[in-house]
Structure formats: structure tokens, C-alpha cells
Amino acid sequence: MSTEQPAPRWAAFARDTNETKIQIALNLDGGAFPPETDARLNVSIADGHATQASKSQTISVNTGIGFLDHMLHALAKHAGWSLALACKGDLHIDDHHTAEDVCIALGYAFAKALGTPTGLARFGSAYCPLDEALSRAVVDLSNRPFAVVDLGLKREKIGDLSTEMIPHCIHSFAGAARITVHVDCLRGDNDHHRAESAFKALAVATRQATSRVAGREGEVPSTKGTLSV
């Protein structure tokens, strides 16, 4: 029996524009970060903002928007990722560029880390509650970027994050990751709970979709024979 370990599913890069400066490192299976991880992330991790470390995961998110950090922390935790992400954006304007660009960068990192999707489940679905709120997420590693998001949020803001940006963040992530996602909050009175249950459901569905299937190594989970085009 072969004891060869699968290749790491990780990515690290910086994304700099006139609007945002982002550094990101992602490991879809938890554990260590790639050797090319930007040294600036070490400072962010040491700061301890939205940070959690265990034997299986390291998570540190610092975007300058507290509620966005909270949502991405939940996404990484329940997807089983190690994620280090730091952003300095033009928050003196508003939260749009920062929230959008961070989720685009996360989607690109996801796609790069995933590579050619062979030997994987491909599909994932999950329901996640948070007290009175219940959300459902369905994910397809389709290479066909599409998102349908209905969270039913009523407040203008949660913390410093505009609620209109919360579904937009999921759209931005799905587009850059080149996946199909459907995320719905089915019930709930508290907008914080509605949003958080949605991100947790997305996390669990994504973890399921990216899981390796024993005995199907190298197989493409598609009748088309490829998910690369």
C-alpha cells in the first residue's frame, strides 16, 4: 500500500491596488502555510486580531472591518482551513473596496490551492443554525462561477460592515474561486445570527465539496471528463 502523501493544497500571494493592499496565505487542509507566505502576515498573526491557533489550524484575519473578520474567521474555522489574511484598504471612503477585494483574493487563493479538482467529492451541502437562525448552503466545484445568495438582512450595518456587502462578499468569493454556491438564510430574527449561520453553512458545504474521496484518486467528478474548461 502506498504511503505517499497528497500534495499540499495551499496558496500565498499579495494583491496590491490603489484601493487595497492584501496579503493572504491559505491551506485548505489546515496545518502550515506555504513557504512563500508574505512576511508581513507574521506581524498580523502576532497582533492576535481574529486569531485562533490549534494543532490543526492557524487562523488570523485582519481587514480593518471587525464583522468581516468575524465572518471570515468562522468560514475558515468550519471549513478546516488555515488562513492568514491582512488588508489595509481605503476605509476612509467606505467598506466596499476592502470587503470586495478581500473576498476576491480569498477566492483566487482557494482556486489556486485547489488546483485541478480530481479525486474530490465536488458537491457539498450543509445546514447550520445559530440560535433562532438557520441557513443552508450548497456548493459545486464546477469551474462555473455563479452565486445565488438570499440572507434576508434588514439592518443597514452590522458593526462596521454594510449588510449589502455581506451577500456581495459571497458573490465575490464564488466568482474568483470559480465555483457555484447557493446560500439561503431560511429563518432568523437577528441579522448577526442570520449572517453568521450563512457563513458557517458555506464553510461546512465547502469542506464537504473539497474532501478527498478514497479510491477515486485522479478521477474527474464530471461526465464531461474535465472541470478545467
Swiss-Prot record:
The keyword Lyase applies. GO terms for molecular function: imidazoleglycerol-phosphate dehydratase activity. Keywords: Amino-acid biosynthesis, Histidine biosynthesis, Lyase. It catalyses: D-erythro-1-(imidazol-4-yl)glycerol 3-phosphate = 3-(imidazol-4-yl)-2-oxopropyl phosphate + H2O. Pathway: Amino-acid biosynthesis; L-histidine biosynthesis; L-histidine from 5-phospho-alpha-D-ribose 1-diphosphate: step 6/9. GO terms for biological process: L-histidine biosynthetic process. Its EC number is 4.2.1.19. The keyword Amino-acid biosynthesis applies. InterPro entries: IGPD_sf, ImidazoleglycerolP_deHydtase, ImidazoleglycerP_deHydtase_CS, Ribosomal_Su5_D2-typ_SF. PROSITE patterns: IGP_DEHYDRATASE_1 (PS00954), IGP_DEHYDRATASE_2 (PS00955). CDD domains: IGPD (cd07914). Pfam families: IGPD. Belongs to the imidazoleglycerol-phosphate dehydratase family. This is Imidazoleglycerol-phosphate dehydratase.
